[in-house]
Design a protein with these regions (language model features):
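Amphipathic alpha-helical packing segments from all-alpha helical-bundle domains
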Residues: 113-139, 146-150, 175-187
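Short hydrophobic/aromatic patch on the recognition helix
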Residues: 39-50
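Hydrophobic alpha-helical connector segments
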Residues: 73-101, 124-126, 142, 152
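Amphipathic C-terminal alpha-helical segment
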Residues: 154-171, 186-191
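Short hydrophobic clusters on alpha-helical segments that form packing/core surfaces
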Residues: 14-22, 30, 64, 68, ...
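Amphipathic alpha-helical segments used for helix-helix packing
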Residues: 97-115, 161-169
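Amphipathic alpha-helical segments enriched in hydrophobic/aromatic and basic residues
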Residues: 22, 31-32, 53-64, 103, ...
Length: 191
């Protein structure tokens, strides 16, 4: 549904409208024409704010990386060991549930892009650094920390995306299932 009150448009407002479409309707719904409709403008006017669909996707990737890094950094403050691991996992899961479309639309690492975006790379490094602190607090260093971080990301990603998609139909509490999953990974990493 198009916005009734037209506010002054800028890049941030355009990107935020795209996030709203992604989270409400999914990746397949985000087109420039759908975004223009949401904003109550003509599609060509979007080019005043974003560099086409590819530019918008890059802006979304940067926003996703920043929001996730912020969420993980906040969760990590003042914690260590298994408590830090659990808090970071819960923060990551909550983020995926709050921004499912944005999260799913930007899964590729900047490291696989032909042309590196410095801002995206910085935000991804910030997330990685928080992750490495989480791993170090469990005694994981070097390559072991990278493997542990991949296990952490895969665990949270898999659980949270299944949860968002309605993949857990049984009546048992998902929070308890997640807590047990996280505890199992912590136990494995501490061996």
């Amino acid at each position: 549904m198009p916005r009734k009150i037209r506010t002054r448009l800028d890049k941030a407002a355009v990107v935020q409208a795209a996030v709203e479409i992604l989270n409400a309707e999914g990746l397949q719904a985000l087109t420039l024409s759908r975004l223009a409709e949401e904003l109550g403008i003509q599609t060509p006017s979007l080019y005043n704010h974003v560099d086409g669909l590819a530019g918008l996707q890059q802006d979304l990737a940067i926003l996703n990386a920043k929001l996730l890094a912020d969420r993980l950094s906040t969760a990590a403050m003042g914690k260590s060991g298994a408590e830090l691991f659990m808090e970071a996992a819960q923060a990551f899961r909550a983020y995926v549930k709050e921004y499912p479309g944005l999260y799913m639309s930007t899964l590729r690492s900047s490291g696989v892009q032909e042309v590196m975006d410095k801002e995206l790379q910085q935000e991804e490094e910030r997330t990685m650094n928080v992750g490495l602190v989480v791993m170090a607090s469990l005694g994981q260093k070097g390559e072991d920390a990278i493997h542990g971080l991949r296990a952490f990301r895969s665990m949270v990603h898999g659980f949270a995306t299944l949860e968002v998609a309605g993949g857990f139909g049984l009546p048992q509490d998902c929070d308890e299932s997640f807590r047990r999953l996280v505890q199992a990974l912590v136990a494995g990493l501490q061996k």
